[in-house]
Amino acid sequence: TTMINNIGENVISPNYVSMAEAATSFASGTGPLARYCDAIGVSGEAAALAEARSGWQDLMSAVQAIEMHPIGPVAENEGFLRHRIHSYASGPLSPCGIDQTAASVDDPGFEITNRSLNQRGVGAIEYLLYEETLQHRCSAGNPVTEVWNDLGETDRKVDRCLAAQLIAEDVAGAATLARDRWSDYLSEFAAESNIGASTQLMTDAFFVLDKLVKDQKLGLPLGINPTCRLITCPDSIESEYSFNSLITVRDNLVAFKRLFSGADGQ
């Protein structure tokens, strides 16, 4: 009971709090993403973009901690809440879908919540902040993006940034909900009558290091995982555009060690 309560209250709960704070700060009207959007087309644009990217990296680091314990409320409905925050574990991004979001941000009635999960989350924000060609990734003749490449560079940057803001707000809402729902669930998780089930959940969570980190994040891109049918599968890299993938693996390992050891190694 002491071990489960220690992990739930002193490791998992702070992870959710940190992620919610990072997501809310990043998405706020005075946060680094908003400042970048305001700076597009003026002399401070490059510095503001660097600041927005740094803010995204901080958010991604916080997300990687909660990726190590996909249990409880975030696992419900096939992990919908988890994948709303970061969809990598459920499959690859849809760059074309993200481009369609950027091309549609000015449309009346556009709702980011109507987009698929592989077009949302921190991975989609990464694409919008780091993909530098500004060319859409859809097939020729796609009605949503057919005029996108003809727009001016500044217009495309602005629309991408507006799309990133919509997605960041959605991530912040999901992160806050995940924090609150874990807080509500904690008493059930740590209840003496549920210790057996909660211990099994933690055991299952430990295998995330093997399945998500070793097999998917490293094994697939390197061609070690038999699911990769080629010599290597670089399209399976978690952070293809920011080159942040090894940093996220490090963050996973740090979070796993704390989860395994408990707060203060207890």
What does each model-found stretch correspond to?
Residues 1-266:
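Mature extracytoplasmic or organellar-lumen-exposed domains after removal of signal/transit peptides
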